[in-house]
């Protein structure tokens, strides 16, 4: 197999999630069965990819949120790949941002990192794991407050 253009387009997890969800719905509606081995492989890959991606923050994103995020990111001097990583992973700490932004020590001040972190957390919705860990920590806090 020959790769014609390796960087034809970069897709966010949200775009892949939407594409695979739509594909799954189309196949359900058309009633195509899993006859060929290739079809079974495609179904397995689609299932595993959707299973993984549904655990990421992209599950709660929408086209409007993605557009708002990209508009807000214009003021930050980041590459397309760095913006894509921020969109896909929704970092919650300065350390996570420093890991995603190449040469962040030279390119960004602490104030810029904090501003970037604020932009990311205020625009992008939390992922399923973030919500679950938040509810778990709230449950623990409530148990500690109740007298035994």
From Swiss-Prot:
Belongs to the eukaryotic RPC9 RNA polymerase subunit family. Component of the RNA polymerase III complex consisting of 17 subunits: a ten-subunit horseshoe-shaped catalytic core composed of POLR3A/RPC1, POLR3B/RPC2, POLR1C/RPAC1, POLR1D/RPAC2, POLR3K/RPC10, POLR2E/RPABC1, POLR2F/RPABC2, POLR2H/RPABC3, POLR2K/RPABC4 and POLR2L/RPABC5; a mobile stalk composed of two subunits POLR3H/RPC8 and CRCP/RPC9, protruding from the core and functioning primarily in transcription initiation; and additional subunits homologous to general transcription factors of the RNA polymerase II machinery, POLR3C/RPC3-POLR3F/RPC6-POLR3G/RPC7 heterotrimer required for transcription initiation and POLR3D/RPC4-POLR3E/RPC5 heterodimer involved in both transcription initiation and termination. Residues 124-148 are annotated as: Disordered. It comes from Mus musculus (Mouse). Gene3D superfamilies: 1.20.1250.40. DNA-dependent RNA polymerase catalyzes the transcription of DNA into RNA using the four ribonucleoside triphosphates as substrates. Specific peripheric component of RNA polymerase III (Pol III) which synthesizes small non-coding RNAs including 5S rRNA, snRNAs, tRNAs and miRNAs from at least 500 distinct genomic loci. With POLR3H/RPC8 forms a mobile stalk that protrudes from Pol III core and functions primarily in transcription initiation. Pol III plays a key role in sensing and limiting infection by intracellular bacteria and DNA viruses. Accessory protein for the calcitonin gene-related peptide (CGRP) receptor. It modulates CGRP responsiveness in a variety of tissues. One of its GO terms (molecular function) is nucleotide binding. Keywords: Antiviral defense, Cell membrane, DNA-directed RNA polymerase, Immunity, Innate immunity, Membrane, Nucleus, Transcription. It is found in: Nucleus; Cell membrane. It is a peripheral membrane protein. InterPro entries: HRDC-like_sf (IPR010997), RNA_pol_Rpb4/RPC9_core (IPR006590), Rpb4/RPC9 (IPR005574), Rpb4/RPC9_sf (IPR038324), RPC9 (IPR038846). GO terms for biological process: defense response to virus; innate immune response; neuropeptide signaling pathway; transcription by RNA polymerase III; transcription initiation at RNA polymerase III promoter. Ubiquitous. Most prevalent in testis. GO terms for cellular component: acrosomal vesicle; DNA polymerase III complex; plasma membrane; RNA polymerase III complex. The gene is Crcp. Pfam families: RNA_pol_Rpb4 (PF03874). This is DNA-directed RNA polymerase III subunit RPC9.
């Amino acid at each position: 197999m020959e790769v014609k253009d390796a960087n034809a387009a970069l897709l966010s997890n949200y775009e892949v999630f939407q594409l695979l969800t739509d594909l799954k719905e189309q196949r359900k509606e058309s009633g195509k069965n899993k006859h060929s081995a290739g079809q079974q492989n495609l179904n397995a890959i689609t299932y595993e990819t959707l299973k993984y991606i549904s655990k990421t923050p992209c599950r709660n994103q929408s086209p409007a949120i993605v557009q708002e995020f990209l508009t807000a990111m214009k003021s930050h001097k980041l590459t397309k790949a760095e913006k894509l990583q921020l969109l896909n992973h929704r970092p919650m700490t300065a350390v996570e941002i420093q890991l995603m932004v190449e040469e962040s020590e030279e390119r960004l001040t602490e104030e810029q990192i904090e501003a970037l972190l604020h932009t990311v957390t205020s625009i992008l919705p939390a992922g399923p794991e973030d919500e679950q860990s938040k509810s778990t920590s709230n449950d623990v806090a409530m148990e500690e407050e109740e007298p035994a």
